[in-house]
Amino acid sequence: MRRTILMWVVTAFGVLALGGVVVVASQQGWFGSKAQRWLTQADTAMKQHRWPEAQAHLDQLLSTMPDSPLIPSALLKLGEVQEAQQHLVEARAAYQQLLDQFRDSPLTSETQTHLGQVNVALLFSSTQTEMDAVYQVQPGDSLGKIAAINGTTVEFLQKANRMSRDVIRPGQKLKVPKGRFSVVVDKSQNQLLLTQGNQFVKTYHVATGANNSTPVGTFHITTRVPNPPWYSPQGVIPYGDPRNILGTRWMGFDKAGYGIHGSSDPSTIGQQVTAGCVRMNNSDVEELFDIVPMGAEVTVVD
């Protein structure tokens, strides 16, 4: 009789304990239902462009269930919601958090794409971030001089400071980048990485040399030419001629004959097909051209 009572007590205690665990698990969303519901509600709101509502669902998930396996998806969606509202600093923070905390996430590539778009948009905006500094124009300054001092381009200064003309005045304050821009080209991935200081800015798909013809090493930009002519073996082919393979921009290396340029055939991007140069889509090379100054370091790796 005593054994029966003891077994009953133990069983009852076990049931109560299990029940408590189930309740706590349910409250915490361990079974995934609550987290998934918030994520689904956020997704539905996003499709209907109800951004504040979507953000509220995502904030609830992120704040109450930080250990949920759905956190990477929530961070990506939060970044998209902030980006859609032009809250670029907040969008960047969400994307960066995902990349920092979940390095092996299958969402990494998609997140980097979003982060790159936001980073460039911030660079060219009037918004000041920790990656920017303020330069006060001195007597005798020109945009070219200011760009050289601050490791940037005239085009960058014009875009970031909403300048329609080259006219500046002493005492005027201009947004300039903090930290030098540099480039790494990965031949095996046909990918170009743009960094500012040691910080990721953006990756671009590129074409590199056929038969391993793109040289490996560290180079520097020594020429920058918009709308470049092509000095082909058959002679000079002007910009705009369909035979000109350089596209809309040329950034030459301190190794004769090599550089980064645009394309007359976008279908080749992502392949190893060039004579040794790094080829980009025209829209991408135009963007890069406005950021990367003379003297910028370019590292090419296998």
Locations of the language-model features?
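Alpha-helical segment of the N-proximal tetratricopeptide repeat
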Residues: 29-60, 64-67
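Short solvent-exposed coil/turn linkers within tandem alpha-helical repeat scaffolds
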Residues: 62-71, 99-112, 153-155, 159-168
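Gly/Pro-biased beta-strand-loop elements
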Residues: 178-264
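Exported/periplasmic cell-wall-interacting domains
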Residues: 237-302
